[in-house]
């Protein structure tokens, strides 16, 4: 097992990465202020892992309740969030009852947001069951639900007490979900580590074949980079915005196509292709480098073409992005492979060109 520590001005917490961690309750107990927990999962994950976790906790004297939500990005909304509150209130959960997120990014985001709101702040722990959640959404304290006009527009920064990334939980992950997680892994190489990017190119076949050592290294390196950035800029006032590489386009795809039609990682992948194309048009990277990005994303089993939408629709969707400042959409682009930068605004003609060529 590998343990990383995310250290912030007001708190710190461990990120445990390894095999067979789900039932290692000793990793959880130090972070429970009371022997009471409420596990939040979904209809896909719960039949696989909920009973194992609940029994392991109860065997150590922890009183456990659970709530099982419908699965999918389309359920990341007020109505589903209220199911968590209903379960907590009907079960007389206290402020020191620890919420445990057992699921992917949607479950983690919603559980964290519920914890931030419940009695003005209850502790929570992340046990991510998808690659995307293990490498990205479970770390850093971003919690949110979607709104029809934009993704993750209603939420809070609220840090977990611990993150438990068990590689064995990825064994049941569908291939499409695994590829979606690889999009976020690729993102880290593109935005800040050219050496890691080269490693991904050399090891993509192993990752897609679920090689345990390769997956653990990919999760470790991704979490190291995420933790370092969050430690420097917890509330996304500066460098943390670089973690949104591919996301300005990607969130527009998710909203434009309807939440759930494209997986988040798929939309980010197509968004990174567009970001690389824009960077090449600006002369920041070569066209051969933009093609290198496209090839790696394709090798991960991810889409390299964005859905066809009028440029006006793209602009309208992106106008609701959280990175908009003074009415201007900000894009995360590539100054070079391994170095991302923020660019305020893109010429409409340039947008037209890259969308036409990559949709």
Curated annotation (Swiss-Prot):
Could you say which cofactors this protein requires? NAD(+); Co(2+); Zn(2+)
Q: Name one GO cellular component term.
A: cytoplasm
Family matches, as InterPro entries: Dehydroquinate_synthase, DHQ_synth_AroB, DHQ_synth_fam, DHQS/DOIS_N, DHQS_C
User: What top-level class of enzyme does the UniProt entry assign?
Assistant: lyase
Please list the reactions this protein catalyses.
Answer: 7-phospho-2-dehydro-3-deoxy-D-arabino-heptonate = 3-dehydroquinate + phosphate
EC number(s) from the headed UniProt entry? 4.2.3.4
Which keywords are on file for this protein? Answer: Amino-acid biosynthesis, Aromatic amino acid biosynthesis, Cobalt, Cytoplasm, Lyase, Metal-binding, NAD, Nucleotide-binding, Zinc
Principal subcellular localization: cytoplasm
Sites binding NAD(+) sit at: 71-76, 105-109, 129-130, 142, 151
Give the co-factor note.
Binds 1 divalent metal cation per subunit. Can use either Co(2+) or Zn(2+).
Keyword Nucleotide-binding listed: yes
Query: Care to name a GO molecular-function term for this sequence?
Result: nucleotide binding
Query: What is the annotated localization of this protein?
Result: Cytoplasm
Which sites bind Zn(2+)? 184, 247, 264
Q: In which pathway does it act?
A: Metabolic intermediate biosynthesis; chorismate biosynthesis; chorismate from D-erythrose 4-phosphate and phosphoenolpyruvate: step 2/7
Keyword GTP-binding (UniProt):
no
Q: Which GO terms describe its biological process?
A: amino acid biosynthetic process; aromatic amino acid family biosynthetic process; chorismate biosynthetic process
Q: What is the purpose of this protein?
A: Catalyzes the conversion of 3-deoxy-D-arabino-heptulosonate 7-phosphate (DAHP) to dehydroquinate (DHQ).
Family named by the database record: Belongs to the sugar phosphate cyclases superfamily. Dehydroquinate synthase family.
- PANTHER family, per the entry: 3-DEHYDROQUINATE SYNTHASE, 3-DEHYDROQUINATE SYNTHASE, CHLOROPLASTIC
Q: What is this protein called?
A: 3-dehydroquinate synthase
**Species, as recorded:** Chromobacterium violaceum (strain ATCC 12472 / DSM 30191 / JCM 1249 / CCUG 213 / NBRC 12614 / NCIMB 9131 / NCTC 9757 / MK)
The taxonomy runs:
Bacteria, Pseudomonadati, Pseudomonadota, Betaproteobacteria, Neisseriales
């Amino acid at each position: 097992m590998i343990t990383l520590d995310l250290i912030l001005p007001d708190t710190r917490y461990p990120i445990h990465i390894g095999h067979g961690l789900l039932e290692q309750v000793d990793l959880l107990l130090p972070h429970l202020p009371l022997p009471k927990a409420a596990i939040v999962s979904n209809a896909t994950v719960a039949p696989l892992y909920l009973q194992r976790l609940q029994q392991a906790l109860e065997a150590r004297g922890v009183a456990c309740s659970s709530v099982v939500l419908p699965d999918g990005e389309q359920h990341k909304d007020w109505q589903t969030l209220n199911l968590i509150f209903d379960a907590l209130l009907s079960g007389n959960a206290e402020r020191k009852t620890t919420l445990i997120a057992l699921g992917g990014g949607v479950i983690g985001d919603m559980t964290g947001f519920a914890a931030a709101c419940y009695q003005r702040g209850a502790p929570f722990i992340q046990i991510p069951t998808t690659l995307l959640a293990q490498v990205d959404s479970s770390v850093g304290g971003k919690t949110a639900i979607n709104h029809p006009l934009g993704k993750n527009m209603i939420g809070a920064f609220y840090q977990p007490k611990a993150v438990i990334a068990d590689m064995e939980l990825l064994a049941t992950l569908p291939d499409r979900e695994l590829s979606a997680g690889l999009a976020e892994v690729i993102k880290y190489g593109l935005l800040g580590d050219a050496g890691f990017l080269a490693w991904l190119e050399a090891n993509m076949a192993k990752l897609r074949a679920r090689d345990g050592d390769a997956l653990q290294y990919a999760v470790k390196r991704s979490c190291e980079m995420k933790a370092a950035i969050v430690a420097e800029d917890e509330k996304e006032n500066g460098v943390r915005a670089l973690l949104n590489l591919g996301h300005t386009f990607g969130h527009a795809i998710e909203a434009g196509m309807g939440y759930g039609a494209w997986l988040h990682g798929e939309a980010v992948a197509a968004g990174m292709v567009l970001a690389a194309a824009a960077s090449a048009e600006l002369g920041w990277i070569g066209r051969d480098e933009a093609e290198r990005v496209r090839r790696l994303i394709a090798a991960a089993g991810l889409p390299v073409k964005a859905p066809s939408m009028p440029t006006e629709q793209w602009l309208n969707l992106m106008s609701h992005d959280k990175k908009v400042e003074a009415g201007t959409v900000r894009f995360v682009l590539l100054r070079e492979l391994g170095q991302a930068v923020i660019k305020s605004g893109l010429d409409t003609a340039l947008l037209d060109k890259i969308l036409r060529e990559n949709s």
